[in-house]
Each structure stands twice: as structure tokens, then as C-alpha cells.
Amino acid sequence: MNFDIARKRMVETQIISRGVKDRRLIEAMLKVPRHVFVEEAMAAQAYSDTPLPIGEKQTISQPYMVALMTELLELSGREKVLEIGTGSGYQAAILATLADRVYTVERIRPLALKARRALDRLGLLNVNIKISDGTIGWEEEAPFDAIIVTAGAPDVPDKLAEQLAVGGRLVIPVGNQFDQVLVRITKQEDGSLIRENVTGCRFVKLVGKYGWGTEE
């Protein structure tokens, strides 16, 4: 299979055709090899218009959803970004090509280690991974110019909102354990939060102290 052709087709038919306009983001998705972040047996499906299982009851998000959430962050290249839910590492790889520094938190050790290997393979040295409860964030590195959460939460965790810089944007799926709304939060100078509902979505649930408490 020619992955370069598959990746180009993915961007043209799934990303650009659905209204994603950020040129830097489009270039990043043309550049980052998504198949590196899935199991070898599923590499041929890596550029399909669907989420894929990556083990540990987790998934790699649909390419369009990765693009949409990233575009909502409005990255210019100078930002420090926090990602909650490293998963396969693909979203972190996209962020790493668009921002200055990426801090990503994954609670499942095998996924974090596998993601680290994939990111290292691509030479993405501006990504820092922490194995921890993502709903707590990464307080010692706060504040962040942008925060992206790749799992569905019952509400926006206060801990994450607190770690968002003034003028920063937080993108997160919010709802029940089966269906959510993609939400963008922008922090104002007075510390207040402006909330925008973007679109319906469906993510695995955000497990942790300030999310869904358990996997059950």
C-alpha cells in the first residue's frame, strides 16, 4: 500500500472537503504518517474515515475529528499545549508540528510507552509525556496556551480550566458516556470562561478524579 497516496487522499476527501481551512494544519496532516500510530495489522486502515482500536479499550480518533479539534485551538506555532489522553500519540504528533511545546498526559502506561516510541521514531522531541490521571492536568507546567481533551467528560474539569492561560482555548467533548458535544472554552482577561458548542461527537469516556470516576 502506498501510504503517501492514502494520506493525501485522506486530507483531500476527509479534511479539506469538510471545511478545514488552516493551511498549517493541512500541511501537518499531509506530513505526519498516521499508520505509524496504529498496530501493523491495521496499517492499511489508518487513513480510513473512522476511529480505530489501539488496545486497552481505547481508540485513535477519526482523522476529521483530529483536524477539527486542532483547528479550534487556533495554533500559531508559539504555544505551549496540554493534551489529555495521549492514546496512540497521533494527535500529539500533529500538535508537535504546529506548536512550540506539547505536554501530554496518559493514564494507561502501555499506551504512553507505545506513543513515546512512535513519536521518537518521527523525531518529535518537543513532546513530553506523563503517565498520570489526565483530569488533574499538569499543574507544574501550567499555564497552557491551549488544552485539548481526547475523551468525553461529564463537564469541563475545573482543574483544566484553572491551568488555561488568559486568552487560551480548551477543546473538550462534554456529555454522557455515549454521546457528547464538542465544546470550546476561551478564558477571558477577568478569568471568566466563554463556552461555544461546536458539534455532536462520540468519544471514549474521560476516566479520572475529575471525569468519570471509573472505567465501569
UniProtKB/Swiss-Prot annotation:
Location in or out of the cell: Cytoplasm
UniProt cross-references to InterPro entries, sorted A to Z: PCMT, SAM-dependent_MTases_sf
Enzyme Commission number, as recorded: 2.1.1.77
Active site (record annotation): 61
A cellular component term, taken from the record's GO annotations: cytoplasm
SUPFAM superfamilies (alphabetical): S-adenosyl-L-methionine-dependent methyltransferases
GO biological process terms, semicolon-separated: methylation; protein modification process; protein repair
Catalytic activity from the UniProt record: [protein]-L-isoaspartate + S-adenosyl-L-methionine = [protein]-L-isoaspartate alpha-methyl ester + S-adenosyl-L-homocysteine
Class of this enzyme: transferase
Taxonomy, superkingdom: Bacteria
Chief site of localization: cytoplasm
CDD domains hit by this protein: AdoMet_MTases
Keywords: Cytoplasm, Methyltransferase, S-adenosyl-L-methionine, Transferase
MF annotations from Gene Ontology: protein-L-isoaspartate (D-aspartate) O-methyltransferase activity
NCBIfam families on file: pimt, PRK00312.1
Main function: Catalyzes the methyl esterification of L-isoaspartyl residues in peptides and proteins that result from spontaneous decomposition of normal L-aspartyl and L-asparaginyl residues. It plays a role in the repair and/or degradation of damaged proteins.
Record-stated family: Belongs to the methyltransferase superfamily. L-isoaspartyl/D-aspartyl protein methyltransferase family.
The protein's name in its UniProt record: Protein-L-isoaspartate O-methyltransferase
Organism: Geobacter metallireducens (strain ATCC 53774 / DSM 7210 / GS-15)
Gene label: pcm
